[in-house]
Amino acid sequence: RLSEDPNVSILLLEAGGTDRKFKISMPLGFLSTILDPKLGWGYMGEPEPHLNHRPLWLPRGKVLGGSSSINGMFYMRGHPNDYDTWAQMGARGWSYDDVLPYFRKMEDSWRGENHYHGTGGPLRVEPIQTRHLLHEPLKQAVLAAGYPDTDDISGAQAEGPALGELTIDRNGRRASAAAAYIRPALGRRNLEVRLESQARRVLFDGQRARGVEYQRGGQVRQVRARREVILGGGVYNSPQLLMLSGIGPAEHLTERGLSVKVDSPGVGRNISEHPCCMMEFAAARPVTFVRELRFDRAARHFLQWLALGTGKFATQLNSCNIILRTDRKLAQPDIQLMSNPVTFSAKVWMPPFTKTPEHKFACGVVVLNQRSRGWLELRSADPLDTPAVTLNIMDDEWDRATMIRGIREARRIYRTSPQAELTGTELLPGAEVQSDDELEAWVREVCEIGQHA
């Protein structure tokens, strides 16, 4: 967007390489991209104090487009109360009414133009094609369990069982930041993109940022900015880069042998991430997406996507995006259920060489408005060293209690008709895990993150 102004010149430094890869473009390829070490930073967190001291996997994209090139493409706004709370806390200009016009301007929504959605923007938003993903049984079960209906989580009713939405273009390709914003601008003479160029620190003249030191091909280089330096490294790399540049908690910087430019204790603090526990249920009948992963069918789906940009590999695997208030006294929802007609461990199978996989449902229970907060520190003054990240997941008792309520509600919904007729044995955490103490112990053992920090 900056390059729309012909009076400015822009240099974009990207630590990773090109995003022009089949598995990035193909929506169902996200199951592979997020695991590919060539496309990510390979971050592992520090031992989590409230998760049995387990380190958490922290996937972040190291490729043009960043994490938007490897993520699940799920499109969903925060609840209006989130933005209004920011404004009430002093972030003027960030209320829901303030940001809604920018959401609308950004979108090219399949829903068309209305009060909540826009058309003609750079980011195409499409519905998940759910006819083969068992959306309707889950939706009806949620309604039968007493929750309100909605057809648009990002619209007037931000609560209930909704059709999931994805950032996918009209040709069935991932609409990442690279595809939607950067690539269309590459023909502009005032924009240069340098790949495999990792920023090391910000350069200063006095107290003013004047450039960036970066590393490319084993060589350390410097570039000077005529106007400004913008950090876009995300939740982990931006604070790391600030601290490497001398901006952060003075005591910590001194311990790492860095000169203090600005003592800013908040840098690297107050990291917020959604806790997520993955439940699994056996399917009572062979109805899950595992059917479509049989080799001959998977090959046909891939070729259909490649030739036409359509079919079952041109979408994602979410059956229903369920947003709930487990306590009606709450001002806004506290739980998201990411319901899928297959587990993420499912793979392409070829009879008779591989055994027919079990049919399973997966349900990610996600705590919204979590209260636990984490932090990030430098391991060393080496810019190529990874940051030390402690998310402090489940530190707050409210988060633990909310997760347990969410697990109980997921159980109730999957045992409510018509979904109940499709649901077999509970596999994770297992029907024998019933008390709050037992559920909390399971949460500490298996809880991961929503990758939304």
Language-model features: where?
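FAD-dependent oxidoreductase catalytic-site/capping-region signature
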Residues: 100, 106-157, 162-164, 287, ...
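Cytochrome P450 core scaffold surrounding the K-helix E-X-X-R motif
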Residues: 22-23, 80-88, 204, 374-376, ...
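N-terminal glycine-rich phosphate/pyrophosphate-binding loop and immediately adjacent elements
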Residues: 1-105, 263-266, 274-283
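Conserved redox-cofactor binding core of oxidoreductases
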Residues: 20, 50, 87-209, 213-215, ...
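Acidic-histidine catalytic/liganding microenvironments
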Residues: 5, 188-189, 416-417
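Short acidic, glycine-rich loop/turn motifs
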Residues: 45-52, 63, 213-219, 324-330, ...
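Glycine-rich loop(s) and the adjacent beta-strand/alpha-helix scaffold that form part
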Residues: 4-11, 16-21, 26, 202, ...
